[in-house]
Amino acid sequence: MYWRKKKIFILISLLLICVCLFSGYYLKITIQKANSYSMSTKAFLYLQKALNIMEKKFIYKDTIDWDSIKKEVYKKAEGSVLTSDTYPAIQLARSLIKENHGFFASPSQMELLEKEEFRFEPPIYRLLEKNVAYLSLFTFPSTSDEADQAYNKQVQTAIRALDSSNVDKWIIDLRKNQGGNMWAMLLGLGPLLDKECIGFFIRNNGEKIPWKHKKNTVKQGNSCCLKSSLPPYQLKNTPKIAVLIGNNTASSGEAVAVAFSGQKNVRFFGQHTSGFANATYPFFLSDGACLLLPVMHFSNRLGQIFYTNMAPDEVINANEATNSLKDPTIEAAIDWLCNF
């Protein structure tokens, strides 16, 4: 027993010595690299961390020549002493990898974002000709659970009011929806969604994470994202739905469109969406700065992945959404709802 304990002690000691030697070697190499760009070790490690996050997590990471990118970015950061001195280099990296959905924000910018009170337009709804229900959802930059619940209540109040007219034909207008909190939007629209699984996030390794709507709750996988404070509501009639999309339908607005994609009795009208059909995730750096990156693609319930934008079933050449009966996209939607 004594020799066994001694052997274990010797092995642990050797392991610790190896770790110390490796750490010392790594530190020496890091200092050499930092010196080669006339950077402080702190600034170099900070920039290295940001680049490593991009290389490992960015949704299009496998299409990028990272050695070339890093060479140019480190050159941009030459002379950096403080972590903040590397910010222009991080922005350059975002530009070089063509990252245009997320952002990089300094600690002071993050403080302003957290304090900013976002205002959002409530949904517009009304009954159109031929007993067609019209519901338009705008951008919803959620800031709290309280705001999410208020938004969900507004959307469901609109749906219940329209459904009281015994409608079975619906127009969901997403042409002015540039994103925000997809879960609040999907929760509000729950009565119009016909399946529990309404879409997926797709990781770079192919892993699928389902979007679920059930019993007035929306989930990402098995994790609850938002639960309604209202009782569940069921439509009086099986809905036939026209979804309107366009160039300003972006991010979470595209997620809502994807949730309806593949549902029976649904057709899309308008123009191609913005092309931000992916999920973003915030990565916080050591000084409090935030690197927001797109990390997962959207897929509809049938497994169709949207790598860029989403195309309508019927392209309508109209400039912008007008929310009026003279709107060619609304006219086309009404024609399909009532005649096909």
Region spans (language model):
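Terminal peptide-recognition signature
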Residues: 50, 93, 135, 172, ...
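C-terminal, low-ordered peptide segments at domain boundaries
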Residues: 96-167, 218-223, 229, 309-325
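Short acidic catalytic loops
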Residues: 158, 162-179, 239, 243-244
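Active-site-proximal beta-strand/loop segments in catalytic clefts of secreted hydrolases
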Residues: 136-140, 173-177, 203-205, 244-248, ...
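Gly/Ser/Thr-rich loop/hinge elements
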Residues: 180-240, 278-282, 295-299, 305-306
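Membrane-interface motif at the C-terminal end of an N-terminal transmembrane signal
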Residues: 18-36
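N-terminal Sec-pathway targeting helices
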Residues: 1-23
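Extended, small/polar residue-biased N-terminal targeting/export presequences
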Residues: 46, 60-130
